[in-house]
């Protein structure tokens, strides 16, 4: 019996080594020296074990989402939070326009991707600029719904130029402050004219390359998922700020993400709600566009639990632009 146990243990170790080698090949991983590679391998092995144990629970029907290896599975949870989120810890208390209660019937499901209002998933890289990507994604949708043109807009423009409005480039910011800058600036440049660098740089805004403008912005009632649903249905993609602080979030692979340990009011990551629907197994969900590249989640998206007590603060800090 002991011999069989040792054999199985050895096979598991060989399988894990194979996963590590496949990971390095798939994502082109190179490390500075053997010590760094050894450390990254240790981090990867811990994460692989965490993923496998979680997915066993998924197979048993105990949770509604599964996890997977992705391009930052060699980063610790703390490193992911430090480099892939980017919310500053403060909150603007007032809306520019009055908040209004939902008055129109709610559609059963909405997906603005199917209407052509959403650009391909982008990647913020090792820069805490999620706030810029979130603000831009909602504006790209609003601009499309008004003009019929889907234009990829410049996150780098916001990273470099909106510090006077409280944003801190790669060190964090808020989407509503991005809109304040665009309003005062009378526009934001296109992505093609002002490409993303994932660093803080000098402002190079050019009024000749404006891709969209903003006249004002609206914040749906804080913590009210019905108000957020109304906004997504009637206004288009909405910038939302969430609690992405749980270890499971970084390795999300698919399904409806319900995390009981999430906070309903604290947020550390900005993303974009581009629709909603209902899953037969996972229940109601939000369709959320992330900015961590297409390798993450469901081709860069996550289905986040909807109508489950504002799980992960999905409706606490939402805002959409008016163009």
From Swiss-Prot:
Q: Does the keyword Secreted apply?
A: yes
**InterPro entries, from UniProt?**
Papain-like_cys_pep_sf, Pept_asp_AS, Pept_cys_AS, Pept_his_AS, Peptidase_C1A, Peptidase_C1A_C, Peptidase_C1A_papain-like, Prot_inhib_I29
Q: Name one Pfam family in it.
A: Peptidase_C1
User: Which residues does the entry assign to the active site, renumbered to this chain?
Assistant: 130, 269, 290
**Keyword Cell membrane: yes or no?**
no
Cellular-component GO terms for this entry? extracellular region
Query: Cystine bridges: which residues?
Result: 127-170, 161-203, 262-312
Q: Which UniProt keywords apply?
A: Collagen degradation, Digestion, Disulfide bond, Hydrolase, Protease, Secreted, Signal, Thiol protease, Zymogen
Q: What is its main location?
A: secreted
The listed locations are: Secreted
UniProt function note: Cysteine protease which may be involved in digestion. Shows highest affinity for proline at the P2 position. Cleaves valine more efficiently than leucine and exhibits 10-fold lower affinity for phenylalanine than proline. Can cleave type I collagen.
Per the record, the similarity remark reads: Belongs to the peptidase C1 family.
Q: What is this protein called?
A: Crustapain
